């Protein structure tokens, strides 16, 4: 009886742990099929959504391409995210101190907790990131005047 109960609990735990990307058929996206679009927030950056809809509460896998010498001011996200640097050298700093940061080379991974202030930048080369999070997406700039969406209006 105890074994059955433990197996049932373990089965439920595994079921709840399966990401929301589960589907009936395999999905393959080759690099040649990627259609990069203008990033909705950062003019000059590009993005492609590989999995999910960032307006919905589901698993999202997104790539973002930043040009050289690009800066993202201090901001937060309402979700935690796992970021992998695919190419280029990327800088990330926690908090709003613009002098401190960690250099991340291709293959580096960093995890950002929800609602933690951070800012990022590139130096002399283009950077491509892959970002994994659970939507809906969102960004809040610490200084509202830094929000590029407001500057575009």
Predicted segment positions?
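A short, N-terminal "cap"/entry segment at the start of jelly-roll beta-barrel domains
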Residues: 21-60, 145-153
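Glycine- and acidic-residue-biased ligand/ion/polar-headgroup-sensing regions
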Residues: 67-70, 77-97
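Bacterial N-terminal signal peptides
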Residues: 7-17
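Double-stranded beta-helix
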Residues: 25-27, 119-153
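His-enriched metal-coordination microenvironments in redox/metal-binding proteins
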Residues: 41-42, 54-58, 73-84
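Conserved short histidine dyad/triad with adjacent acidic residue
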Residues: 60-77, 101-105, 113-115
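Short acidic-glycine-tyrosine-enriched beta hairpin
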Residues: 53-55, 90, 95-115
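Positively charged n-region of N-terminal signal peptides that target proteins for export
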Residues: 1-5
């Amino acid at each position: 009886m105890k074994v059955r109960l433990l197996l049932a609990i373990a089965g439920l735990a595994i079921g709840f742990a399966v990401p929301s990307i589960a589907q009936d058929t395999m999905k393959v996206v080759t690099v040649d099929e990627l259609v990069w679009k203008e990033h909705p927030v950062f003019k000059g950056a590009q993005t492609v959504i590989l999995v999910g809809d960032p307006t919905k509460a589901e698993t999202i896998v997104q790539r973002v391409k930043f040009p050289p010498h690009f800066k993202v001011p201090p901001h937060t996200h309402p979700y935690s995210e796992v970021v992998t640097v695919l190419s280029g050298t990327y800088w990330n700093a926690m908090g709003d101190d613009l002098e401190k940061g960690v250099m991340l080379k291709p293959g580096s991974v960093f995890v950002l907790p929800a609602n933690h202030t951070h800012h990022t930048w590139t130096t002399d080369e283009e950077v491509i990131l892959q970002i994994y999070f659970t939507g809906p997406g969102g960004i809040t700039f610490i200084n509202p005047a830094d929000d590029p969406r407001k500057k575009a209006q």
